[in-house]
């Protein structure tokens, strides 16, 4: 379907561009949300007549988003979640979790503004893009941890999972006797030492 864009849409175009999109995308998202018009002669005339007003409204929304970006840029949100010993979360972190955490810090962010490139399913620190306006994006840090102490370590740059495995294996050494027969237990490992071996 040919449409005329009423605002800049990522990976499609800018205001006034005529683009072709799939019918379902146009009918179910772009047209109902007033982000586009069907490309026909009547709508072209309506768009050209209102172009200055549409661009002025877009500029006002962009300026408002630019002002809000200072309030959101660089914020760090900490989300405490249950996870396995390997760091796999039981579930995942959703855009709603992130938007709620940002709202608690006073940011005016809706869940539709948060752009997750891929699902967050392990503990760690992630950079998440927040699109306040089609032309204004900022980055926030999302720190997913099992406890507040762990979150503090992660914010200092410590990889908690690697550190945990290093601690577990650091003191572990295996005694190995190359001359031992298979299935034979060395006498010094038996309880009671040599007396137990002689008995």
Swiss-Prot record:
Highest taxon in the source lineage: Bacteria
InterPro entries: Ribosomal_bL9 (IPR000244), Ribosomal_bL9/RNase_H1_N (IPR009027), Ribosomal_bL9_bac/chp (IPR020594), Ribosomal_bL9_C (IPR020069), Ribosomal_bL9_C_sf (IPR036791), Ribosomal_bL9_N (IPR020070), Ribosomal_bL9_N_sf (IPR036935)
Keywords from the named record: Ribonucleoprotein, Ribosomal protein, RNA-binding, rRNA-binding
Region (Disordered): 169-199
Pfam families registered for this protein in UniProt: Ribosomal_L9_C, Ribosomal_L9_N
GO terms of molecular function: rRNA binding; structural constituent of ribosome
GO cellular component: ribonucleoprotein complex; ribosome
Annotated GO biological process: translation
Primary role: Binds to the 23S rRNA.
Xref: PANTHER family: 50S RIBOSOMAL PROTEIN L9
Protein family (similarity comment): Belongs to the bacterial ribosomal protein bL9 family.
Name of this chain's protein: Large ribosomal subunit protein bL9
Native organism: Novosphingobium aromaticivorans (strain ATCC 700278 / DSM 12444 / CCUG 56034 / CIP 105152 / NBRC 16084 / F199)
Gene: rplI
């Amino acid at each position: 379907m040919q449409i005329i864009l009423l605002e800049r849409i990522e990976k499609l175009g800018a205001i006034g561009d005529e683009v072709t999109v799939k019918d379902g995308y146009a009918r179910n998202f772009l047209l109902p949300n007033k982000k586009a018009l069907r490309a026909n002669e009547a709508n072209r005339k309506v768009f050209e007549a209102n172009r200055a007003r549409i661009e002025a409204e877009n500029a006002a929304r962009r300026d408002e988003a630019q002002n809000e970006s200072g309030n959101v840029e660089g914020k760090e949100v900490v989300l405490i979640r249950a996870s396995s010993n390997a760091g796999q979360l039981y579930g995942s972190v959703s855009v709603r979790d992130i938007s709620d955490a940002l709202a608690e810090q006073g940011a005016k962010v809706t869940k539709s503004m948060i752009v997750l490139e891929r699902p967050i399913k392990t503990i760690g620190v992630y950079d998440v893009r927040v699109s306040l306006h089609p032309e204004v994006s900022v980055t926030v840090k999302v720190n997913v941890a099992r406890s507040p102490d762990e979150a503090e370590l992660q914010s200092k740059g410590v990889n908690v999972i690697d550190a945990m495995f290093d601690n577990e294996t650091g003191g572990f050494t295996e005694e190995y006797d190359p001359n031992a027969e298979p299935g034979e237990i060395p006498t010094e490992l038996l309880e009671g030492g040599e007396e137990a071996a002689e008995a």
